[in-house]
From Swiss-Prot:
Protein name: Peptide chain release factor 1
Gene3D superfamilies linked to this entry: 3.30.160.20, 3.30.70.1660, 6.10.140.1950
Modified residues (N5-methylglutamine): Q236
Cellular localisation: Cytoplasm
Length: 362
């Protein structure tokens, strides 16, 4: 904890500098700079407040120890001991909270995401489950105040998706949904099953952060652009014109379709932004082999034996295999109630980081 405390002293000094800057008329008049500084100040506020409370409690404990060692009044000594008992519990709690707040932040946590869901092993049933997962994430996004926009989809005749990609925008989307990367297994009786037998199918989920601005130039010759009539929201007007846009990056085969915006030009701009983000993510791994290996690590091959989570419909049970968490409320989870699972995953990975930090500081 000593190393963490040394870092905190520097952090508090920087926090106080930020507060002074926010009161500077020159900064106040520069909206962009003021917003950047105020966001940094807000991000640091909780840990600074907890550290100040921690220091205040430590001082009170020391003062009480002095009373205990020097005071002759038994009642005062007893009162000081009782206070210290409570303060020591509070200090231990604050230490744990501060350690978590001081863990290295994932630089992508504040970013929006591109989520790709694919029906994998299991044929039609896998594609139906891919659609169920999409609806689950859409409902969860609604509870968080996030927006979901369709990028591209490959629907199946039975009503599911062979593949569907969406963009989810809002506050700290990646920080919560990054744990959804992987193979999701479903066990249920398909609607086409006449014997009532339970089948096992799989869908894979890939979650990629959306980069607002990426340092990549795409050769226009490498991009095929198709326009078509939108079938989504927007009223009659949007269906009368070919406002929807599909862009294909020919060297990588990456496809982005956008129809959420009001005009073709807006759809083009948004599609290009997303395409750049996805192509950038692709080339980050230098070549296709590394990209495929990275994606396989993230989502698995889709084989039934690989999974991060199992959704068992007959028993209304969902199990996250990474942390051994089982909940007997699958119906509520599929209705978007994901917080209990996501919070448990966050705690699990925070605990792992804390253990690593303790080893490094030992």
């Amino acid at each position: 904890m000593d190393k963490v405390m040394a870092q905190l002293e520097g952090l508090v000094a920087h926090y106080e500098e930020l507060q002074e800057m926010m009161a500077d008329p020159e900064v106040i008049n520069d909206t962009k700079r003021y917003m950047e500084i105020s966001k940094e100040e807000a991000d640091m506020r909780e840990v600074v407040q907890k550290y100040r409370k921690y220091k205040s409690d430590i001082k009170e404990i020391d003062d009480n120890k002095e009373i205990i060692s020097s005071e002759s009044d038994d009642d005062l000594v007893e009162m000081a001991k009782e206070e210290n008992s409570e303060l020591e519990k509070e200090v231990a709690k604050l230490e744990d909270e501060i350690k978590i707040l001081m863990l290295p932040k994932d630089p992508n946590d504040d970013k929006d995401i591109i989520m790709e869901i694919r029906g994998a092993a299991g044929g039609d049933e896998a594609s139906l489950f891919a659609g169920d997962l999409l609806r689950m994430y859409e409902k969860y996004a609604e509870t968080q105040g996030w927006k979901v926009s369709l990028i591209d989809s490959e629907p199946t005749e039975v009503g599911g998706y062979k593949r569907v990609a969406v963009m989810i925008t809002g506050d700290k989307v990646y920080s919560k949904l990054k744990y959804e990367n992987g193979a999701h297994r479903v066990q249920r009786v398909p609607v086409t099953e006449s014997q009532g037998r339970v089948h096992t199918s799989t869908a894979t989920v890939a979650v990629m952060p959306e980069y607002e601005q990426v340092d990549i130039d795409l050769d226009p010759k490498d991009i095929r652009v198709d326009v078509y009539r939108s079938s989504g929201a927007g009223g009659q007007h949007i269906n009368k014109t070919s406002s929807a846009v599909r862009m294909t990056h020919l060297p990588t085969g990456i496809v982005v379709a956008m129809q959420d915006q009001r005009s073709q030009q807006q759809n083009r701009e948004k599609a290009m932004q997303i395409l750049k983000s996805r192509v950038y993510d692709y080339y980050e791994s230098q070549n296709r082999d590394k990209y495929d290996a990275k994606r396989k690590d993230a989502v698995g091959t889709g084989d039934r034996s690989e999974r991060i989570r199992t959704y068992n419909y007959p028993q209304n049970r969902v199990t996250d295999h990474r942390i051994g968490l089982t909940l007997n409320k699958l119906d509520r989870v599929m209705n978007g109630e994901l917080d209990e699972i996501i919070n448990a995953l966050v705690l699990y990975y925070q605990t792992q980081q804390l253990e690593k930090m303790a080893e490094e500081n030992a």
